[in-house]
């Protein structure tokens, strides 16, 4: 391709994606055909405009900052983009707070396996027969109030370790209590980190897609 064609591809990318970086300069130089195909592919959300440019940058931040990815160059770039689009430091911090709960999936994976193994050994009653007292009922009600949903998984978590559940509840509720992003956008962040190719957490994605749809 000619330099003129490359400049046209670069201009098209900037128009659709709203930024440019030295990384894309290298890709364009190495393989214009691949760059052109990727540019068209990655620009579809921007052209559809279902989400505002700032919200799209928040989603990029969440994916790059998630514990399954931790991609520093992308994180820095998309924070810069979000700030340029008018994002506040509190909004970006809220995105990071929402993203940080991804670590709980250690338990969402492990706890159901633990329960299955206990039941297979005939020991399921050790947990199944636990009845919630006022303390546990209060935690459950607070979770539903703060987070807007409940899942059967949380019943087992709450029975296994009410103290741990309470700490997670306090931790995960911070952006829901003091944050400024609308609830629907919070759910978009959860959807993004659950469906990222480095995670692909089906059950979490289902819960948060359902929540987002209920929120409009």
Predicted regions and their residues:
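Acidic, glycine/proline-rich low-complexity segments that act as flexible tails and inter-domain linkers
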Residues: 1-55, 84, 107-185, 214
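Short acidic alpha-helix initiation/capping motifs at coil-to-helix transition points
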Residues: 33-39, 68-75, 163-169, 199-205
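Generic structural signal for hydrophobic core residues of well-folded globular domains
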Residues: 45, 62-66, 99-103, 118, ...
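Amphipathic alpha-helical hairpins
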Residues: 48-59, 74-92, 180-188, 204-215
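Amphipathic alpha-helical interaction segments
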Residues: 49, 66-70, 86-89, 102-106, ...
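Amphipathic, charged-and-aliphatic alpha-helical interface segments
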Residues: 56-71, 186-201
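Hydrophobic, ordered structural segments
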Residues: 93-115
């Amino acid at each position: 391709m000619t330099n003129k064609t490359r400049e046209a591809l670069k201009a098209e990318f900037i128009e659709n994606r709203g930024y440019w970086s030295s990384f894309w300069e290298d890709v364009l130089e190495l393989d214009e055909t691949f760059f052109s195909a990727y540019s068209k592919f990655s620009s579809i959300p921007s052209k559809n405009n279902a989400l505002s440019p700032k919200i799209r940058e928040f989603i990029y931040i969440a994916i790059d900052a998630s514990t399954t990815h931790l991609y520093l160059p992308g994180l820095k770039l998309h924070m810069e983009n979000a700030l340029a689009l008018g994002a506040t430091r509190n909004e970006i911090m809220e995105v990071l707070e929402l993203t940080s709960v991804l670590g709980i999936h250690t338990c969402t994976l492990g706890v159901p396996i633990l329960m299955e193994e206990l039941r297979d050994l005939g020991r399921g009653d050790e947990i199944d027969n636990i009845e919630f007292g006022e303390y546990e009922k209060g935690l459950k009600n607070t979770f539903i109030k703060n987070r807007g949903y409940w899942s059967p998984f949380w019943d087992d978590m709450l029975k296994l370790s009410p103290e741990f559940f309470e700490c997670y509840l306090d931790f995960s509720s911070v952006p829901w209590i003091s944050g400024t992003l609308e609830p629907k956008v919070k759910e978009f962040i959860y959807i993004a980190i659950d469906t990222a190719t480095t995670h692909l957490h089906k059950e979490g994605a289902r819960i948060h897609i359902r929540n987002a749809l209920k929120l409009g």
